[in-house]
Regions:
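Conserved NAD(P)H cofactor-binding loop of Rossmann-fold oxidoreductase domains
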Residues: 58-61, 100-101
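N-terminal Rossmann-fold NAD(P) dinucleotide-binding loop
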Residues: 3-4
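Conserved glycine-rich Rossmann-like NAD(P)H-binding loop of the short-chain dehydrogenase/reductase
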Residues: 15-26
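Conserved Rossmann-fold cofactor-binding substructure of NAD(P)-dependent oxidoreductases
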Residues: 31-53
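C-terminal substrate-binding subdomain of Rossmann-fold SDR/epimerase-dehydratase oxidoreductases
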Residues: 174-303
């Protein structure tokens, strides 16, 4: 999802892009190496001929999946990251942008999460991303590899048909006429950042040497699940049937972030949640129902 936005942006900027992915996405403009990021031979093939910089987005990103499959999460998120760092160093990479998460910090200890927050993850997903951050720190200190760590909040935008995050789940429920289940009371709050704004941060992380270490990438505006539901109803003109289920283990009750460091480094996010949501709905409303049900298909945007 995020990778398609980043690849599209980099190609538009004239960069030569090579992609490593478990799943084949036929695209004549991209040199694709299909395989597991934890496989050193795959990475050596992908990085043969040298590389200027690496964007590391490959991960198990679902909190629920990480709790169901912690070993797989560790293999992909930790072993894969370690293998990529070693292969990237050997290939002469000058910089690496790493997609991390604010889930590395666990419960909030201050009015807003900043880069100085204590790392205290609550789930295998958060823990493996924290381990990835430590590997980035070690490679910077030991080998001089500049690593820009992006602590992303909830990313949404066009092309998220296969995702299980709240915006995708809401869109799917509206198009298919289903009931939307809220985990808990719906008052838990999250920050939402548009994929295009994340892509802009990634581009800065690749090109600006002042981007090193962690930076919080979020809108700075948090919304409760109930507020997101209201916003979706306003954009789509549809009132969803809602049920409440139990809260999820390891879920943070609040994510409120302060992106001041990223802003000071030149990041300039453009999308309000409402404007971004309108674009997401425009895409979903044009999809046929079979594609929605299957979690595939896009209209006029990177997947």
């Amino acid at each position: 999802f995020i990778g398609r936005h980043v690849v599209s942006h980099l190609l538009g900027a004239g960069a030569r892009v090579k992609v490593v992915d478990l799943v084949a996405h036929p695209d004549p403009s991209v040199d694709l190496v299909q395989g597991d990021i934890a496989d050193r031979e795959i990475l050596e093939e992908a990085l043969s001929g040298g590389v200027d910089a690496i964007v590391h987005l490959a991960a198990v990103t679902s909190v629920l999946k990480s709790m169901e499959h912690p070993e797989l999460t560790y293999r992909t998120n930790v072993e894969g990251t370690n293998t990529l760092l070693a292969a990237g160093r050997a290939a002469g990479a000058g910089a690496l942008v790493f997609a991390s998460t604010n889930a590395v910090t666990g419960p909030m200890e201050a009015p807003a999460i900043t880069e100085s927050a204590t790392l205290r993850p609550l789930t295998p997903y958060g823990a493996t991303k924290a381990a990835g951050e430590m590997l980035m720190s070690a490679y910077t200190a030991s080998f001089g590899l500049r690593c820009a760590v992006m602590r992303l909040t909830n990313v949404y935008g066009p092309g998220m048909q296969a995702k299980d995050s709240i915006v995708a789940r809401l869109m799917r429920a509206i198009r298919l006429g289903g009931t939307f289940e809220i985990y808990g009371d719906g008052r838990q709050v999250r920050d939402y950042v548009h994929a295009a704004d994340v892509t802009a941060a990634v581009r800065l992380g690749l090109t600006d040497e002042s981007w090193a270490g962690p930076a919080v990438i979020g809108s700075g505006r948090s919304l409760s699940v109930l507020e997101v539901l209201d916003a979706v109803s306003q954009v789509t003109g549809t009132e969803l049937k809602v049920t409440h289920g139990p809260g999820r283990p390891g879920e943070m009750p609040a994510v409120i972030v302060d992106p001041s460091r990223a802003l000071a480094l030149g990041w300039d996010p453009r999308y309000s949640f409402e404007d971004g949501l309108a674009g997401v709905w425009q895409e979903w409303s044009a999809l046929d129902l079979d594609a929605v049900a299957a979690g595939v298909g896009t209209v006029g945007a990177p997947r």
